[in-house]
Amino acid sequence: MAGIGFELKKLFRRKGLFATLRAYGYAGVICTGPMLLGVLLQVGMLVLCGWAGAARADQDLLVCMVTYTLLASLTVTSFFSMPVTRFLADMLYEEQEQTILPSFWGSNTLLLVGGCAAYGIFLIFSGATLMQGLLCLWLFAEMIVNWNAMSYLTAVKDYRGILWAFVAAIGISFGLGYLLIFLLGAPVLEGFLFAITVGYGCMMLLETLLLHRYFPQSKESPWTFLRWVDRFLPLAFTGLFTNLGLFAHLVIIWAGPIGIQVKGLFYGAPYHDVSAMLAFLSILITTVNFVVSVEVNFYPKYRAYYSLFNDGGVVGDIVTAEEEMLAVLNRELYYTALKQLFATAAVISLENTLLELLPLGFNDLMHGYFRTLCVGYGLYAIGNTVMLILLYFTDYLGAVLASGVFAAAAAVGTVISLFFDQAFYGFGFLAGAAVFFLLALLRLDYYTSSLPYRVLGQQPIVAQTKSGRFTKLALFLEKAAERGESDAKK
């Protein structure tokens, strides 16, 4: 993400309202693309369903199918996301760009084989029709490639191309959905599901073309990145735990008193799910601000501080640079939290007026969920920002600890909330997010209190190469590929 912040700094140097809006738009799409796209498409399709007079059962099933597919794909890709990002950073630093595209297809292969097998088994027994099941599986595969490509696109500086891929996915989905349902009279559920699938497919195609434009094709091993998973295993679990903490409360609510069996294995809680989707949009201000403000202003100080260790800086300069870096960090984190507080307060104040404009049938219970989850997502956004700063300082233990506690606290808190009145269901996630924020903040304060020792004293004297199951898997796949090539030559 540091590369993104560095490049965005160039955009923000340009004067004018439109230049500023464009930079914020680029940052928003790059950093929140997966969930933002999913939420916008679901809300938009629900609005179109309302205009089309679709039955409530069809609307609920459409939301369930897209939500299940979205959450499953994000969870599957979350384990590789951070190690792959670290692999990309190392390869770009070492000017080994020829390894990037092979690793993209290698990671896609593993994710698609494992993910599609598991999700396919679920769909077989889910009660979905053959057409619905095939569309869900197709959408799942596209989402996996899209989310994986977003990790790789952090190294691409063509922000206009990324933005157009995002806009194309939304435009094609809505346009095709309108054409199929309103003009051709296709079934509402299958028509909108097909439209969303085609939209994600176009986004996948555009993102893949961008990657091929910037990185060369080569015959390098597509499994090299697996060694980075072993080396940075805490990063893999940090990504997984963060996603589990973010989504577990939704699944638990589906099994609670307000959950309904929509069809077969598809369960949902429409009152809670729609409120959660819209509340999630309230954290965009913090997610974008992290890149635009924290990284753009903090990263130069961070780089100057660590360069003093690498270039033989004197003690006085190191102490001064540390004080300046931490002062900028504290200021930017304070402003980030303040902006999220104002954004949450504004959304809660205006939600009655704004939500009444959408034909989503909001009632008092949904308004309550929305307000509670806005606060919860706001705390999560700030906590996640602090956790990312821990990763900046290579405090992988602190990051995985904070994310693990977040996943456990959000899940346990949601389970406990089920024993209370339905109006309190969102407070379980809110409590988990509050614990996440406090723990990450305390860990950051503790870690930075002795930063020179962390930089110098905790480094291994002799370089160590970690080898585990993923390295063994890489060796096995490489040998299998070599045997296949030798057999083909014979």
Where are the regions that the model predicts?
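Specific pore-lining/lateral-gate transmembrane helices of multi-pass inner-membrane transport
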Residues: 92-104, 273-356
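Small-residue-rich midsections of specific transmembrane alpha-helices
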Residues: 63-89, 243, 247, 276-301
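Hydrophobic alpha-helical transmembrane segments
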Residues: 165-212, 423-445
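Hydrophobic faces of transmembrane alpha-helices in multi-pass small-molecule transporters and flippases
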Residues: 20-36, 163, 221-248, 333-342, ...
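Alpha-helical transmembrane segments of multi-pass membrane proteins
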Residues: 67-72, 108-113, 121-153, 163, ...
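Alpha-helical transmembrane segments of multi-pass membrane transporters/permeases
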Residues: 153-179, 390-412
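Transmembrane helical elements of multi-pass membrane transporters/channels
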Residues: 195-199, 203-295
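N-terminal membrane topogenesis motif
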Residues: 1-41, 60, 64, 226-235, ...
